[in-house]
Amino acid sequence: MKHVIIGMAGHVDHGKTELVKALTGVDTDRLAEEKKRGITIDLGFARLDFPDGSCASIVDVPGHERFIKNMLAGAGGVDLAMLVVAADEGFMPQTVEHLDILQLLGVKDGLIVLTKTDLVDEDWLNMLEEDVKSRVKGTFLEDKPILRTSVRTGEGIEALREALHDLTLHAEEKSARTPFRLPIDRVFSVGGFGTIVTGTLIDGHIAVGDEAQLMPLGNQCRVRNLQVHGRDVSAVYAGQRAAVNLAGIKKESISRGDVLCRTDSMQPSLMLDVKLQNLPDSKRIIESGSRLHLYHGAAVRLAKAVLLDRDALRPGESCYAQLRLSEALAARQGDRFVVRFYSPLETVGGGVILDEHPYRHKRNDARVIASLAVRESGSDEAKLVQAVGERGADGMTLADLAACFDEPEEKLVEMLAVLCARGKLVEIAPSRYLTSSTLDRLWTDCETMLTKYHREHPLHAGMRLAEARQRLLRGKARENADAILACFAREGKLTLTAEHCALADFSVHLTKRQSAIREELLRTCRAAEILGKKQDALCALFDKKDCMECARVLESLLSTGELVLLAPELCVEKSVLDAVDARVKAWFETHDTLTLGEFRDALGTSRDHTLLVLEYYDRRGILRREGDVRRPGAQFGEIEK
């Protein structure tokens, strides 16, 4: 079922609350002060039922200029607008301001309602309609229906209900794919139930039992119960007004303007990159560095507006800007906002968030402007490539992209395949992507790094993988680093072993003397069997003039894995260890455990040397010590290959 929020807007005392009551039977003025003063101070909500069984939620917002903050808190989730104009007064200051706010918040459809028509004659109504048409020209309400109503006589109420029903049928359906998010506009507690928050669910769906988080502080909680218009429900979907009973958190820990969201789906930010607009009828110039009041959802923040491509934003103009906030805010790309002048407090503009987690920008940076232009109006493919590119060597997974883009996974997979075929993206591992430009940059760095390494260590088989990961990718996740190196290997640029990487065209070249030393070292270590040989003993086999060459060849043999360090300085020939591996494997085919004594007897060595060998296997993860015995370790499968 489609869920639609209808927002009432208009000047104070123009009959919004009475109109809601006539449509729904609900008096949305709930506060004693509202009853006493006869004006709406805070938000009111009502359910509007239609004959076909469908329904919509109506948000009644205050019309008095002193309560614009409350009006903004309720307007954030509005799909359709009812602009209310009293027939006996016409357009008034808050009518204009409310219309500006709805326009800034991206509301795209609605209608205009003339109230109190019983107080004026037909000629006046005709003139008023013409005036209203001229006032809404150029806005989303241009050419929209204008309906005449009177709560006192009942005129036009049913026609209005039918018109609203028709609008809801054509309203755009919200996506339930993105993680749920509910900006909180009320928080209170009820005896026996605990903490309750209310708001409009603007993304995703939330269910009883869900784990949730309150931003910007990050406090954890759980959804105990849900209500929509006073009725218990098991789940709430985007576009519905809801009351959420929370467990695990006190009312005092929550403020109006906080956001209830899926755990770890949002991160607060102190900066926002935006497209900022100064209203055409604004009386203010927004200069770079100006302080403004930012209204986002139900939250209010002080913000410093840094204009990125000019010094001042005049009425009717728009530009890219960075808003630097006084307090952290939880937002998402594509969210709308409103800004009001710092003092005096008046609505001057608003816009759309392009990046909720930007770096701090310098002004007049052409690359930043170009990047923001893609975020604002680029194609879906361009936005996807930019999103992946901004993650650099981390890249993005399909799951990452699904969280960022409100698209079905099937469409994302199709777009990714096209972009890979065009050479814009590279799938470095299943469902993990980097931009081609990022991969090219990484290869340039990798080639430079390995060329230098081969020049300095010509007898090494290559750079150790752990060192290559650290130097090339500066501590990125091992899985990602390995995927990038493996990608280079698939392209024929690298050779990879379990321990090393080298340029594909690199090979170790030994002199005749180095080759002779190599053979002697291998023969000696092979003859020593599992006892091995100390490095200084191996170097002592040669004349002093060959000591330096011996050290180089030893280093080469260790890098290629032909010799292995059983313990510091103690070298064992690889085929000897392979034979011991075979014994260990055979032992555990018939035994569950291995003791030091059993291994000593199998090797025919001393107890101390047997312990060295066991500790070597422990370090590799081949074996795992449990008290006085060993069992197969996490890497035992290595010796089965």
Language-model regions: role of each:
Residues M8, V120-W124, S134, I249-L565, ...:
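C-terminal effector modules of nucleic-acid-centric enzymes and ribosome-associated factors
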Residues T117, D123, S134-S282:
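Conserved catalytic-core segments of large NTP-driven translation/proteostasis enzymes
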